[in-house]
Amino acid sequence: MPRVPVQTAADAPGESREALHELERRMGRLLNIHAEMAHAPVVLAAYQGIQDAITKHGSFDAKTREAIALAVAAVGKCAYCQSALTVGGRAAGWSLAETVAIRDGTAELDRKLAALLAVAREIAGSTGNVSDAAWQAAREAGWGDTELTELFAHVAVNLFTNYFNDYVQTEPDLPASPGLEGWSPLG
């Protein structure tokens, strides 16, 4: 059972309603995570602020963004996020099998993307600390200062949602992704 009840846009605090309507329009429905974030308008605004900055100023294409998100969700073992991001990954052009392989770290990716995901996994798994070897491999694969700095924003927003889902024990409202059947919010 979630620690914070799911609410509708009509029930949410006034400061959250516009954002919820926009999320509902963009996603086709209101997801439990967003309906829970809306209890505290600052939480929903913080999430949307990072997402909007990434959309407006980010340089990664949709497939790269979703691959980063899948890798981070897997490190955090957030089943809710992995299920949501599997849907997002499919929409960005990854096959179902590829989304699972990205999560598992077994995807056959080009050297450049593989190096970027290795850095993302290290950021997510070690409180931001990245080994010199992973950093250098990303540099040698063609990533520059701008992209490696931007990567941190992508990892941060995904850790934000991972932690939030675990914190409030978001109930599933998405189909389980392969390998996550029977999942609960606490995995």
Please report, for each region that a protein language model flagged, where it lies by residue.
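Hydrophobic alpha-helical segments
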Residues: 1-187
